[in-house]
Amino acid sequence: MFKFNEEKGQLKCSFCGKSQEQVRKLVAGPGVYICDECIDLCTEIVEEELGTEEDMEMNEIPKPKEICDILDDYVIGQDKAKKNLSVAVYNHYKRVNSGKGNDEVEIAKSNIAMIGPTGSGKTLLAQTLARIINVPFAMADATSLTEAGYVGEDVENILLKLIQAADYDVEKAEKGIIYIDEIDKVARKSENPSITRDVSGEGVQQALLKILEGTVASVPPQGGRKHPHQEFIQIDTTNILFIVGGAFDGIDQVIKRRLGKKVIGFGSHEKQEDLDTGQLLSKVLPEDLLRYGLIPEFIGRIPVIGSLTPLDEEALIEILTKPKNALVKQYQKLFEIDHVELEFEEEALQEIAKKAIERKTGARGLRSIIEGIIVDVMFDIPSREDVDRCIITKETVSDDDGSPKLVFRDGTVKLGNEKLPKESA
């Protein structure tokens, strides 16, 4: 009930009791009045509450061990890389949170480089990290980037992808993660600075420097090149975590040459010839990246280096079966929808892993191998209701004309490439 001063015939604020003469503005509502001073006070209270909630969200970032445990559910192996990434990501978002205070100590930004062969899990690790932290995530291919003014994508277009992933919420995008793949492809051709213009190599590294370090970038809302009189989205990259990744083919030889200089003599126990590719990659240093072709300024902006080892047969089999979204589980789900049980024999899984190693495709090649094996069966099964089980054997994978074994509901067993019996009415 609103307050009314009967003696003077004046309305009063329902919250503080001040009359309309004592305040600048009195806003009327259904049966109540509120003055401008109470409105300001309410606004401050709401802003403080929302600000506290945001800080709480930042404080609820999983601890490094918790991040690593979640990564274990989706990514097989690469324990050292997962540990390094978990610590780096946790520290990055601690830094973001600490920046809100007035502390004189400013924590430097720590972007991450991931070095490892194709199919070792670089992209999956970056995607999973973004899901764990629940921040916008964007992925870009360094090979499509060129220096500003040349044919190709400007580096600002990477930021546009992140803004789009955040539904154009710039404030949210400013705390996101960007993964730049194939960064090794923009390495310059030699250690020495290029005399000629290298617009897709060293030029791209130079163009990336500012956004890696932290700057307010102007991004064209529709992408493409910048034009005069165009509206831009302003985004601060200071708190965006950049993860760059690449196979860096041949860097193991660079590391081997560096180690070779240190093992000459009778006192050395571990010679570089005894180290495999994975062990060599684990010893990578910034100076190796410099020799490979990354410029010193670029290396200085990615202080955290994580190496991923090539996946062996055992790891590939685990990738097929262990993670929550394992490939075998995915295909079993697809067959289950058609009321058919899909079964992989242990020897079949071993053969699939061997094929992936032979093709040097790592985990990335597993899906195409399985798809090639069962595509004919997936074509026929949806049209039939008499198939009970589909079994993938060693011969199915190893033989050129291998085919899955089909078990029918009447007990009949046939190979998928045999002429199938007509379905009974």
From Swiss-Prot:
InterPro entries: AAA+_ATPase, ATP-dep_Clp_protease_ClpX, ATPase_AAA_core, Clp_ATPase_C, Clp_protease_ATP-bd_su_ClpX, ClpX_bact, P-loop_NTPase, Znf_CppX_C4. SMART domains: AAA, ClpB_D2-small, zf-C4_ClpX. CDD domains: RecA-like_ClpX (cd19497). Residues 1-54 form the ClpX-type ZB domain. ATP binds at residues 117-124. GO terms for molecular function: ATP binding; ATP hydrolysis activity; ATP-dependent protein folding chaperone; protein dimerization activity; unfolded protein binding; zinc ion binding. GO terms for cellular component: HslUV protease complex. Keywords: ATP-binding, Chaperone, Metal-binding, Nucleotide-binding, Zinc. SUPFAM superfamilies: Glucocorticoid receptor-like (DNA-binding domain), P-loop containing nucleoside triphosphate hydrolases. The keyword Membrane does not apply. Zn(2+) binds at residues 13, 16, 35, 38. GO terms for biological process: cell division; proteolysis involved in protein catabolic process. Belongs to the ClpX chaperone family. PANTHER family: ATP-DEPENDENT CLP PROTEASE ATP-BINDING SUBUNIT CLPX-LIKE, MITOCHONDRIAL (PTHR48102:SF7), ATP-DEPENDENT CLP PROTEASE ATP-BINDING SUBUNIT CLPX-LIKE, MITOCHONDRIAL-RELATED (PTHR48102). Component of the ClpX-ClpP complex. Forms a hexameric ring that, in the presence of ATP, binds to fourteen ClpP subunits assembled into a disk-like structure with a central cavity, resembling the structure of eukaryotic proteasomes. ATP-dependent specificity component of the Clp protease. It directs the protease to specific substrates. Can perform chaperone functions in the absence of ClpP. This is ATP-dependent Clp protease ATP-binding subunit ClpX. It comes from Oceanobacillus iheyensis (strain DSM 14371 / CIP 107618 / JCM 11309 / KCTC 3954 / HTE831). The lineage of its organism: Bacteria, Bacillati, Bacillota, Bacilli, Bacillales.
